[in-house]
Swiss-Prot record:
Primary location recorded for the protein, binned into one broad class: cytoplasm
The protein's name: Adenylosuccinate synthetase
Reactions catalysed, as given in the entry: IMP + L-aspartate + GTP = N(6)-(1,2-dicarboxyethyl)-AMP + GDP + phosphate + 2 H(+)
EC number(s) recorded for this UniProt protein: 6.3.4.4
Top-level enzyme category: ligase
Amino acid sequence: MRKADLVVGVQWGDEGKGKIVDMLGLNYDMICRSQGGHNAGHTIWVDGVRYAMHLIPSGILHKNIVNVIGNGVVVSPDVLIDEMAQFDHLEGRFYISDRAHLNLTHHGLIDQAKERLKGDKAIGTTGKGIGPTYADKISRSGHRVGELLEPERLCEALMSDFEMNKSLFNALGVKIPKRDELLEELKRYKEALAPYITNTTRLVWKALDDGKKVLLEGAQGTLLDIDHGTYPYVTSSNTISAGACTGLGLNPKEMGEVIGVIKAYTTRVGFGPFPTEDKGSDGDKMCEVGKEFGTTTGRRRRCGWFDAVSVKYASRLDAVDKYALMKLDVLDGFEVVKICKAYQYNGETIDYVPTDLENVTPIYEDLEGWDSVKGVTRYDDLPKNAKRYIERIEELTGVKVGLISTSPERSDTIIR
């Protein structure tokens, strides 16, 4: 039996997992999503064409790869149907877990209303209803994709839920759908999605038992994990590598190589602690050159220097075997590049991530910059200072950099 390999984000998401999955995916028979929803964005550049996806695994661009949305994902039918329309002949190469939970219109409306009511205490959610959907799941009041196969029954269950929560809907100013309109919507979902709904756990098991190569595609990043991230400024699922097991029905012994994806700098969307954030011209340059605007929301990402402390912490949580270092070219032209090697915390120097990360001050190490790495495909051809930067990341985190991206194009990648 083969083991499933995993690509996981090791920062606050947006590390460039899509490009790595797209590139490595050519060597796999099946690619699976295990958690998150359409709050996650996958951006891939192929031959100068930009593909942005939020639910469908990146392997969908290759017609010989089977793509799976696992039980740990929360699925917006509207978003999924729109994404599916971009691709031809999905039959036999795309499947949705019947156990994945439904992210419906009212979840997004509730999410947005709660954020508005929080005012300056808002978390910075994408407003896509991910949190409310997972909340319904945990409270055992949610509904799953498999229920779409019986739209009349699901409609009655939802109307009952709405009636039970009428006071909450009214307080938030969220309009309860009309039964007839809801039923028509659910029937439309069934018609579009029914051919792809199945027990994906058995599907993945069979693939592994048959010796197929399976790749798991993580969403968001480790520092957004509901348990181990910068709570409450986190997502609503387990983004660490162990979440891939529960989100697909795999056991830990079925996990193979873990590839941790990191940017050569650091970004974050929304609120929450960010020790190495640069609010000056350097951060602005990273944002402009790196085109740091969210795939899902279009929001400008906060930018700053590489944080080796948080990456080392996340890498331990994920059991990372090697890194894929992304966007090294964005740092081209900086006279000095910085790496956070430790934190100042309560008068002490520490090399770990405390629970109250907002109370740390980064301790930087300055390294000399380089002119350009753009388009380089051989490690030996990199400038000396760029190599030193990569080696210093390895020294501080204890993990080897195995892949290096030097432009958005799939082909501009160094494999060591």
